[in-house]
Regions:
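Short, charge-rich amphipathic alpha-helices with coiled-coil/heptad character
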Residues: 20-55
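Extended, charged low-complexity scaffolding/tethering segments
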Residues: 1-27
Length: 157
């Protein structure tokens, strides 16, 4: 998955949460209990929606981590002079690297590795956002309960 797709997906998720998290402070026709009941009934569906997003992104992260491990192995072979001859024909490399310190420098600066690591970090940021969204969805039960208790208090019940 490229950065544009990840960014588009993240913007879509944030837009969905902005819409889903909005609660009218002025409840329709002052029917507090009905509106709060509706909000309460939507909580499991919201939780499922954002849990699915979280699960999908966790799978993307796992795939990227596997891709990163594979790429690091290929780059170690390339920089160490152990890759296939056709690899060097396509992308020549002057000499093989013998020290682990120098290998680390080349791996840390490799563009392919940097791009995959950047995607992993971006997906981690998205997962962190979704983790907070899921906590807010779970907390909605308590917010609805408090609002209903407030309504009872105001009405003298």
């Amino acid at each position: 998955m490229n950065f544009d797709k990840l960014h588009h997906l993240f913007e879509k998720i944030k837009k969905e949460w902005k819409e889903d998290s909005h609660v009218e402070h002025e409840f329709r026709n002052k029917q507090y209990t009905t509106d709060l009941g509706q909000i309460s009934m939507e909580i499991p569906f919201l939780h499922n929606k954002y849990l699915n997003h979280y699960t999908d992104l966790s799978q993307v992260k796992t795939s990227l981590e596997f891709e990163l491990r594979k790429t690091i192995k290929e780059k170690r072979e390339y920089y160490g002079g152990e890759a296939e001859a056709r690899t060097y024909a396509e992308k020549p490399f002057g000499s093989s690297i013998k020290t682990s310190e120098k290998m680390r420098v080349y791996l840390d600066a490799d563009e392919d590795i940097i791009n995959i690591e950047a995607k992993v970090k971006y997906v981690e940021m998205m997962l962190n956002y979704l983790d907070h969204v899921l906590k807010q969805v779970s907390a909605r039960n308590y917010h609805v309960k408090n609002a209903i208790e407030w309504e009872r208090f105001i009405n003298g019940n």
